[in-house]
Every structure is written in C-alpha cells, then in structure tokens.
C-alpha cells in the first residue's frame, strides 16, 4: 500500500471502455458494511472514495447512470460501464451530481486509498476484522468529527452547490 499516493490517480472498468482520473486526494474514504452495499457489490463491504465530481475527469467513454435504491430510501445513481457493467462510482441523492463515491477497487492502484473509516459496522460480516487504528462506527457519522480540516474546507466550498441542487429537486 502506498503511504502517500501521487495524484492524479487513474482507474476504470474491467473492459477498459470507461476510464477516469481523480485529480486530487479524496475528501475521505469509507469502508461501508451496510447490507445494501454488500448486496450491490456482491462483497462484504464497499470501499468508496468521496470526491467532488469536478475532480473526476473522464478519459474515455461516459458511464451509464443507473437509478438504484439505497439504504436512505432516497436512492443513488450508479455509474456503470455500458459494456461490462462494472460500477465505477455512485452519486447519492443527498449531494446529487456534485459528490462522487468512487469505487476504490476500480483504481489502477486500488491499494493507494485505504479506508479512513468503517461505517455501518453493526451489519458487517462477523469474520471481517477491522484494524484497531481505523475509526469504526455502527451506522453513519458526523463528518465534522472525523474529516481532516482540508476536507472540511473543501466541503464548505462546494456546499452551496449541494444546497442549490437540493432546492432545484424540491421545486
């Protein structure tokens, strides 16, 4: 695992049709153990790097956005390769298209981004062992409590766009 990844990082789907680049470090990396992520990923958890959409650059074909239910009941749009159907990121209803949850496993060097936090550990598989030095919470969490100051400053900068998106969704 890289102690300090060099940006940009690139990734894509299994067949190579969809390729992307993340231009900066993510805000935070979640290892989500909720049953929804387990089902959607077909694995014991989903590892997602939260990053502003404008820091994710398309290098090849556009992914197809698929409306999918989520644990919150508000849904998500999963970006999948239209050929091999691999999910490369999600946009959840709360922040819409402004914030992406990039699937870390789709990065060319997926070991570059270990989890900053384990979430929904109340539903994790009992045989999954969480490193004692990584925060773990039974459900979701307050970002103000766990995110580094740089990430909180970035969130403050894009939050007006999230509010505008939410207002447009209500009208």
Where are these regions (language model features)?
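A short Gly-Trp-Pro
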Residues: 1-10, 17-171
């Amino acid at each position: 695992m890289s102690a300090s990844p060099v940006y940009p990082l690139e990734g894509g789907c299994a067949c190579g049709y969809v390729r992307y680049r993340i231009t900066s470090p993510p805000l935070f990396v979640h290892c989500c153990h909720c049953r929804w992520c387990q089902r959607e990923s077909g694995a014991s958890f989903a590892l997602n790097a939260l990053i502003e959409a404008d820091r994710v650059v398309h290098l090849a074909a556009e992914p197809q956005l698929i409306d999918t239910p989520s644990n919150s009941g508000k849904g998500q749009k999963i970006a999948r390769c239209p050929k091999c159907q691999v999910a490369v990121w999600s946009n959840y209803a709360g922040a819409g298209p402004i914030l992406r949850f990039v699937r870390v496993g789709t990065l060319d060097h997926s070991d570059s981004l270990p989890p900053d936090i384990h979430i929904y550990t109340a539903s994790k598989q009992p045989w999954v062992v969480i490193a004692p030095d990584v925060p773990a919470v039974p459900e979701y969490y307050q970002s103000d409590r766990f995110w580094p100051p740089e990430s909180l400053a970035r969130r403050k900068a894009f939050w007006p766009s999230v509010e505008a998106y939410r207002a447009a969704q209500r009208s």
